[in-house]
Swiss-Prot record:
Transmembrane segments: 10-32
Topology relative to the membrane: Single-pass membrane protein
Gene: SMIM11
This protein's UniProt keywords: Coiled coil, Membrane, Transmembrane, Transmembrane helix
Compartments, as annotated in UniProt: Membrane
Name of the protein in question: Small integral membrane protein 11
Keyword check for Cell cycle: no
Tissues expressed in: Expressed in heart, spleen, liver, stomach, muscle, lung, testis, skin, PBL and bone marrow.
Superkingdom per UniProt: Eukaryota
Lineage of the organism: Eukaryota, Metazoa, Chordata, Craniata, Vertebrata
Main location as per UniProt: membrane
Cellular component, GO, one term: membrane
Length: 58
């Protein structure tokens, strides 16, 4: 067995952990962006419906 490789295992684990953390944070950021965009779209639709119902009442 190559013992030189085993010396680098902690470094490789730190790199793997960092990559995983970056991917998780990126995924969470994308989900937050999508949710905010969807909420803005829903608010816009509600405002349009409110305007249309006010027009019908008048």
């Amino acid at each position: 067995m190559n013992w030189k490789v085993l010396e680098h295992v902690p470094l490789l684990l730190y790199i793997l952990a960092a990559k995983t953390l970056i991917l998780c944070l990126t995924f969470a950021g994308v989900k937050m962006y999508q949710r905010k965009r969807l909420e803005a779209k829903q608010q816009k639709l509600e405002a349009e419906r409110k305007k249309q119902s006010e027009k019908k009442d008048n």
